[in-house]
Regions:
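A cross-family phosphate/adenosyl-ligand binding-site feature
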Residues: 6-221
């Protein structure tokens, strides 16, 4: 890793995915999630402050993205997958904060569906983007996020370690979004940073958490 005279990183590239994807059922309806993009944006700011070359792949977010960032806008899981696959080979770090839809509609209707009738829909799984990353770039430092709901600390950590096993992530940021003040869209969170070690971060602002995450990343790379 090369440093400039201020301690910043030269030519080191960070890719961050953020926000929630949207899967259309017809031209005006679809399914999405409550991801706000706040954590991804705080991580992007940390990367920028530390001198990295930052690119953001942005789905649906509730935050304003500063113009200093190179931004690629996407909507669906498929669009995000294509954008990531194109960029991953040239990146040094990928931080996957986006909440990507696990399912999409098998048949998207080209017209507005009649709301006066009962509706039965078929869903099929989307591609697990994070599981492709190490195949495309074995040398990349891969950071995953794992959001769980109403489970024990031990189970959250076990879930994070399972992602490491399945996707080859180098680091996983895990949390329980059912905790008070830690839900999607909140300004605070409580997380566990998991690899061979486990760093427990108590309830803190997402800005503070982003700073801690980057400190850990820089210890590992």
């Amino acid at each position: 890793i090369n440093l400039n005279k201020w301690g910043g990183f030269i030519h080191e590239k960070v890719l961050i995915s953020m926000g929630g994807t949207y899967e259309p059922i017809d031209p005006i309806r679809g399914i999405t999630n409550k991801s706000s993009g706040k954590m991804g944006l705080e991580l992007a700011k940390q990367a920028y402050i530390r001198g990295f070359d930052v690119t953001l792949i942005v789905a649906n977010v509730s935050v304003r993205i500063p113009s200093v960032f190179n931004v690629i806008k996407v909507e669906t899981a498929e669009e995000m997958n294509k954008a990531i696959k194109k960029l991953i080979p040239s990146q040094d770090i990928f931080i996957s904060t986006a909440a990507v839809s696990d399912f999409k509609f098998e048949d998207k209707d080209t017209h507005k569906i009649d709301s006066s009738k009962a509706l039965s829909i078929n869903l099929k799984p989307t591609i697990k983007i994070i599981r492709q990353i190490k195949e495309l770039n074995p040398d990349i430092f891969l950071v995953g996020f794992k959001a769980e709901v109403n489970i024990s600390k031990e189970d959250i950590i076990a879930s994070a370690k399972q992602q490491i096993k399945d996707a080859g992530t180098d680091l996983v940021i895990a949390n329980d979004v059912s905790d008070e003040n830690c839900h999607f869209g909140s300004d605070n969170n409580k997380v566990w940073i998991v690899d061979d070690d486990i760093v427990s971060v108590p309830l803190s602002s997402k800005k503070e958490i982003a700073n801690i995450i980057f400190d850990v990343i820089l210890e590992k790379i």
